[in-house]
Amino acid sequence: MAALGSLPTLPEGLTYDDVLLIPQRSPVRSRKAVNTSTRLSRNIHLKIPIVASNMDTVCEDKTAVTMAREGGIGILHRFCSIEEQCAMVRKVKRAQSFLIEDPRMILPSATKAEALEELNWSGRKGGVSCLMVVDDLTSRRLCGVLTKSDLTFATGSALVETLMTPVSRMVVSTNTAITLEEAREVMRTKRTKNIPLLGPKGELLYLITRSDILKLTGNLNATLDSRGRLIVGAAIGVKKEDHERAAALVDAGADVLVVDIAHGHSDLCIDMVKALKVNPLTNKVDIIAGNIATAEAAQDLIDAGADGLKIGVGPGSICITRLVAGSGVPQLSSVMDCARVAKKHGVPCIADGGIKTAGDICKAIAAGADTVMLGNMLAGTDEAPGRVLVKDGKKVKIIRGMAGFGANISKAEREQRLDEDVFHDLVPEGVEGSVPCKGPLAPILKQLVGGLRSGISYCGSHSIADMQQRARFVRMSGAGLRESGSHDISKL
C-alpha cells in the first residue's frame, strides 16, 4: 500500500471516445470486397460481428431471427421461465429450416375444425401450409398430407381422412442425407411443394418445404447450423436451477450458451463453466462466459473451459455498476487486456457495452474484439420486445438494464418470491429508460456493417483479422472529440 499522503502509480484506462484509428494506405477498391466474417466462439462462425444483447427489451425470438438472417446472432434473455425461453429457441429454429424435425401432425380421425386450429398454429407467423397425417403421434407412420386448400369446401364435421391426399399419391423420400440442391431438383421435376423424409417403417422423420428452400437460397448471408436452421444463443445464470435451464435449452436447439452475470470473474461463474463443460447434456455446445474486464479474469475463464468471453463491466448505457459499486474498467482498455490473453488460446471475445456508433464498432474490433454486443442500438426496433408508447408526442419503446430494479422485481414476481424484503434488499446496478422507435432491424444492421467495412478499409485491410494486425490508434483530446462530430452548422 502506498504511504499516507502519496498516490500509487495507477494504470490508465481508455474508452472509445479517447482514441481514433489512424488511416493507412488501402488496397481496397470497393467496400463490398471487405470480409466481415468472424467467430463468436471457438466453433461458431458469423458473417457479421454483431450480437444482439440478452436483454428482455432487446432480444427475444423476433430479434434473434432477423439477426441470424443478416449474418449475426441473437442471445435470448433469461428473464423468463425455462419453458418460455426454450419456446423462443424453437421458434427461431423453425423460422427458417431445411429439414423440419417436428412438422405439425394430425390424425386421420380429426375434424376440419381441429385441422384448421393446427394449420393456424401460433408458433409460426401465418401458421403452417400443410399438416402431415399420421396413424399415431408416437409411431408417426405417414398416411397423407392435408393443406389449407383441401379444407376450402369441406363441411365442419368432415374428417381429415376424407380430405387428405393419401401417401400413395405423394412424393416422398427415404434419403435422410438429401442435400439442399437435391431437394430443390426433386421439387422442380416432380412439381411438389413438400417432401416428407421417411424411415424404414414409413415413419415420418423430417419434412422439407418449398418455402423454406426459397428462404435459404434467397439469403446467402444467413448464419445457419448444419441442418440449415438459423443459429441462436441463450443466456443462463449461475444458480442451481440454471443447470436445468442449460440442459433444456440445448435440447431445444440452442447453438451456444452464455453464462451471463454482472461479475463474471467469480467462483460462481467459473464453477458453472466447468460444470457445463463436463455435463453430457450441455457440453456439445460452446459456452461463453462473462462479464469480465481484466486479463486475469480472461485467463481464469479460459482455464475453466470457456469457448468465448464477454467483456464489459459498466460501459452500457443502462448500466450504473461503476456508480453503485465503484468498479469497472474503461471499455477499450478492457477489450485490449482481455483480448491479448484470449488470442493466445484461440478464444474469441465479445465487446459488450459502450457502443454508440459504427465507429465504436471499428475501434472495438481493432482493439481485439471478435464481435460486439449491442443493446441500446437495437432497442426500439420493430423486432425488439415491448409495447410502443408515446412520450412527448413521439413513439418510444422501453429499455432496461437486467441488473435494474424493474427487471429484478419482475424476476422475483415470476419466481413467486416477491415480498417486502425484496424491495428493501435490492441494490440496482441498472436503470430504465426509453428509446425512439427505429423501424425494422435489418436496415440498421446494414448501416452498421457498412461503417465497419469503411473502417476496415481505412486501416488498409481486407478483413477483420487483417485489421487487427495492422490497426494503429491515436489518442485525442476533448477538442479532438468535438472536432470529430459535425460542428459549426445548424443540423437539419
Swiss-Prot record:
Keywords: CBS domain, Glycosome, Metal-binding, NADP, Oxidoreductase, Peroxisome, Potassium, Purine metabolism, Repeat. GO terms for cellular component: cytoplasm; glycosome; GMP reductase complex; nucleolus. K(+) binds at residues 314, 316, 319, 322. NADP(+) binds at residues 30-31, 78, 260-262, 313-314, 402, 454-457. Disulfide bonds: none annotated. InterPro entries: Aldolase_TIM, CBS_dom, CBS_dom_sf, GMPR, IMP_DH, IMP_DH/GMP_Rdtase_CS, IMP_DH_GMPRt. SUPFAM superfamilies: CBS-domain pair, Inosine monophosphate dehydrogenase (IMPDH). Homotetramer. HAMAP family: GMP_reduct_type1. This is GMP reductase. It comes from Leishmania major.
